[in-house]
Regions:
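Short glycine/proline- and aromatic-enriched beta-strand/turn motifs that initiate or cap beta-hairpins
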Residues: 21-85, 248
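Predominantly the C-terminal beta-signal and adjacent terminal strand-loop region
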Residues: 26-28, 185-195, 199-248
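Extracellular loop and loop/strand-boundary signature of outer-membrane beta-barrel proteins
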Residues: 26-28, 74-79, 123-130, 179-185, ...
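Glycine- and aromatic-enriched membrane insertion/assembly motifs of diderm outer-membrane
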Residues: 56-121
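Outer-membrane beta-barrel translocator domains and adjoining extracellular loop/strand segments
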Residues: 52-58, 115-124, 167-176, 221-227
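Outer-membrane beta-barrel channels and translocator barrels
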Residues: 34, 98-100, 147-151, 202-204, ...
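Residues on the lipid-exposed face of transmembrane beta-strands in outer-membrane beta-barrel proteins
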Residues: 41-45, 87-95, 107-109, 138-146, ...
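Residues that define the transmembrane beta-barrel architecture of outer-membrane proteins
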Residues: 35-39, 83-87, 132-138, 152, ...
Length: 248
């Protein structure tokens, strides 16, 4: 909550500063609105979770393959995915399609750990699985902008994203691990849709755009395997809440 409050205060400060500059009478922004092509960079804060689809028999204990009639785990009570933080760094490639429409491509490197909580009938056997990811992302979006009011615009954005997980195979190699120590793994290639709302603030030599975005994967990211943490799962979809600062 404290971090969210700090973000809101920061956003308000930027807004106040921008409108103060409007009073100075400058049509600022470094001429970015007059360019067909506008480069830049972005910093992103993400909060991510899995949308979990479970198998019909997800609650049953996982059997011990070496000892018939015995089980490696207790009966499951719930499987959930809490929000977990991450961050990203990227570049902006913007193309002006019209006075109120842009095409924006933002190649980004994202570092993110997602979590899955397993609660068993015995509360002491609670287990949390961490799924570490490092992804190269290629979002493509159409930006629909309001008319510029001196040094301010609002906009909506919609588009799609291709993500490729580049985390080292060595970090996810659990071939020599016991079944109760195995990892839940993601597919390497992920497709997502995105929607966002943002604001363009024009300073003397650049444009700053804070943006709030929701992103959901289209395909299941689960790589199915036979062990106690993957077997109860049918599908996993990613859901990201993202706050970004774009500089152009």
């Amino acid at each position: 909550m404290r971090k969210r409050l700090q973000l809101i205060i920061f956003f308000i400060s930027i807004s106040v500063g921008s409108f103060a500059q409007v009073g100075q009478g400058g049509n600022w922004g470094g001429g970015v609105d007059d360019q067909i092509f506008s480069p830049g960079f972005t910093f992103q804060y993400l909060s991510s979770e899995y949308k979990i689809y479970k198998k019909v028999d997800w609650q049953r204990p996982y059997p011990n393959p070496d000892v018939p009639g015995q089980f490696l785990t207790d009966s499951l009570k719930s499987i959930s995915s809490p929000l977990s933080p991450g961050f990203g760094l990227g570049f902006i490639t913007g193309f002006k399609l019209g006075n109120n429409t842009d095409l924006r491509i933002t190649p980004t490197l994202v570092f993110l750990d997602r979590l899955i909580n397993y609660e068993y009938a015995d509360p002491e056997k609670f287990y949390q699985q961490k799924v570490a990811t490092t992804t190269v992302e290629f979002p493509v979006g159409f930006k629909l902008k309001s008319d510029r009011r001196l040094n301010f615009r609002a906009y909506l954005l919609a588009g799609g994203k291709y993500s490729m997980d580049i985390i080292s195979k060595k970090k996810t190699d659990d071939s020599g691990f016991a079944l109760t120590e195995k990892f839940v793994k993601n597919q390497k290639n992920i497709l997502s849709y995105e929607v966002a709302i943002g604001f363009d603030f024009y300073f003397e030599y650049f444009k700053l755009s804070p943006e709030f975005k929701l992103s959901n994967s289209i395909n299941s990211v689960l790589k199915p395997e036979d062990h106690p943490y993957s077997s109860p799962l049918d599908k996993l979809y990613t859901r990201n809440f993202q706050f970004s600062l774009y500089f152009e």
